[in-house]
Amino acid sequence: MREPDRTPIQRRDILTGKLKQDSGGESRFLHISSAIVTARPDRAADLARHFATLPGTEVHAVQGAKIVLVLEGASVGEIRQPHGAISVMEGVFSANLVFEQILPADEREALS
Protein backbone atom coordinates (compact mmCIF):
# COMPACT_ATOMS: atom_id res chain seq x y z
CA MET A 1 0.00 0.00 0.00
CA ARG A 2 1.42 3.38 -0.95
CA GLU A 3 1.76 6.22 1.52
CA PRO A 4 -1.17 8.70 1.27
CA ASP A 5 -0.45 12.23 0.08
CA ARG A 6 -0.74 14.59 3.05
CA THR A 7 -0.30 17.88 1.18
CA PRO A 8 -2.27 20.55 3.08
CA ILE A 9 -5.65 21.59 1.71
CA GLN A 10 -5.91 25.22 0.64
CA ARG A 11 -9.08 27.15 1.49
CA ARG A 12 -9.49 28.26 -2.13
CA ASP A 13 -9.41 24.62 -3.25
CA ILE A 14 -12.34 23.84 -0.97
CA LEU A 15 -14.36 26.89 -2.00
CA THR A 16 -13.88 26.26 -5.72
CA GLY A 17 -14.33 22.50 -5.49
CA LYS A 18 -10.92 21.94 -7.07
CA LEU A 19 -9.11 19.93 -4.46
CA LYS A 20 -5.80 18.63 -5.69
CA GLN A 21 -5.62 15.24 -7.33
CA ASP A 22 -2.97 12.59 -7.03
CA SER A 23 -0.63 11.85 -9.93
CA GLY A 24 -3.04 9.21 -11.25
CA GLY A 25 -5.74 11.85 -11.73
CA GLU A 26 -7.94 10.55 -8.94
CA SER A 27 -9.21 12.81 -6.20
CA ARG A 28 -7.35 12.56 -2.92
CA PHE A 29 -10.57 13.24 -1.03
CA LEU A 30 -14.03 11.84 -0.50
CA HIS A 31 -16.78 14.41 0.02
CA ILE A 32 -19.81 13.24 1.96
CA SER A 33 -22.89 15.44 2.39
CA SER A 34 -26.32 14.84 3.79
CA ALA A 35 -29.44 16.53 2.53
CA ILE A 36 -33.03 16.89 3.63
CA VAL A 37 -35.48 17.00 0.75
CA THR A 38 -39.03 18.21 1.30
CA ALA A 39 -41.43 16.94 -1.35
CA ARG A 40 -45.12 16.65 -2.01
CA PRO A 41 -46.27 13.90 0.36
CA ASP A 42 -48.00 12.01 -2.47
CA ARG A 43 -44.73 11.99 -4.51
CA ALA A 44 -42.16 11.37 -1.76
CA ALA A 45 -41.93 7.58 -2.17
CA ASP A 46 -41.59 7.79 -5.98
CA LEU A 47 -39.02 10.57 -5.72
CA ALA A 48 -37.00 8.60 -3.16
CA ARG A 49 -36.88 5.61 -5.52
CA HIS A 50 -35.66 7.91 -8.30
CA PHE A 51 -33.04 9.57 -6.06
CA ALA A 52 -31.64 6.12 -5.23
CA THR A 53 -30.78 5.65 -8.93
CA LEU A 54 -28.63 8.80 -9.09
CA PRO A 55 -24.86 8.20 -8.96
CA GLY A 56 -23.35 8.81 -5.52
CA THR A 57 -26.77 9.21 -3.90
CA GLU A 58 -28.23 7.04 -1.14
CA VAL A 59 -31.68 7.35 0.42
CA HIS A 60 -31.54 6.79 4.17
CA ALA A 61 -35.09 7.60 5.24
CA VAL A 62 -38.48 8.67 3.96
CA GLN A 63 -41.06 9.96 6.40
CA GLY A 64 -44.10 11.81 5.16
CA ALA A 65 -42.84 14.61 2.93
CA LYS A 66 -39.22 14.42 4.14
CA ILE A 67 -36.46 12.42 2.45
CA VAL A 68 -32.98 12.05 3.97
CA LEU A 69 -30.15 11.61 1.46
CA VAL A 70 -26.40 11.05 1.62
CA LEU A 71 -24.40 12.32 -1.36
CA GLU A 72 -20.83 11.19 -2.04
CA GLY A 73 -18.31 12.39 -4.59
CA ALA A 74 -14.68 13.15 -5.30
CA SER A 75 -15.35 16.91 -5.27
CA VAL A 76 -17.90 19.49 -4.20
CA GLY A 77 -18.95 19.66 -7.86
CA GLU A 78 -19.84 15.97 -7.86
CA ILE A 79 -22.19 16.65 -4.97
CA ARG A 80 -23.62 19.87 -6.38
CA GLN A 81 -24.66 18.19 -9.65
CA PRO A 82 -27.17 15.69 -8.20
CA HIS A 83 -28.20 18.17 -5.49
CA GLY A 84 -29.00 20.77 -8.14
CA ALA A 85 -30.93 18.25 -10.22
CA ILE A 86 -32.92 17.09 -7.19
CA SER A 87 -33.80 20.63 -6.11
CA VAL A 88 -35.56 21.41 -9.42
CA MET A 89 -37.45 18.14 -9.86
CA GLU A 90 -41.20 18.30 -10.10
CA GLY A 91 -42.72 17.57 -6.71
CA VAL A 92 -39.68 18.79 -4.74
CA PHE A 93 -40.27 21.86 -2.57
CA SER A 94 -36.73 22.15 -1.20
CA ALA A 95 -33.42 20.30 -1.04
CA ASN A 96 -31.06 21.51 1.67
CA LEU A 97 -27.54 20.31 2.35
CA VAL A 98 -27.20 20.02 6.12
CA PHE A 99 -23.76 18.47 6.59
CA GLU A 100 -20.50 18.06 4.70
CA GLN A 101 -17.38 16.13 5.57
CA ILE A 102 -14.19 15.82 3.54
CA LEU A 103 -12.12 12.71 4.17
CA PRO A 104 -8.81 11.57 2.69
CA ALA A 105 -9.56 9.08 -0.09
CA ASP A 106 -7.57 6.39 1.70
CA GLU A 107 -10.31 6.30 4.36
CA ARG A 108 -12.95 5.16 1.80
CA GLU A 109 -12.26 1.50 2.50
CA ALA A 110 -12.89 2.05 6.22
CA LEU A 111 -16.37 3.39 5.42
CA SER A 112 -17.35 0.46 3.18
UniProtKB/Swiss-Prot annotation:
Entry's Gene Ontology molecular function annotations: signal sequence binding
* Record-annotated disulphide pairs: none
Q: Does the keyword Lyase apply?
A: no
Q: Spell out the GO cellular component terms annotated for this protein, sorted alphabetically and separated by semicolons.
A: cytoplasm
Q: Which UniProt keywords apply?
A: Chaperone, Cytoplasm
Reading the lineage from the top rank, the first entry is: Bacteria
Note whether Oxidoreductase occurs among the keywords. no
- Fetch the Pfam families from UniProt: NapD
Outline the subunit composition: Interacts with the cytoplasmic NapA precursor.
- What does this gene product do? Chaperone for NapA, the catalytic subunit of the periplasmic nitrate reductase. It binds directly and specifically to the twin-arginine signal peptide of NapA, preventing premature interaction with the Tat translocase and premature export.
Q: Give the family from UniProt.
A: Belongs to the NapD family.
Q: What is this protein called?
A: Chaperone NapD
In its UniProt entry, the species of origin is given as: Paracoccus pantotrophus (Thiosphaera pantotropha)
Record gene name? napD
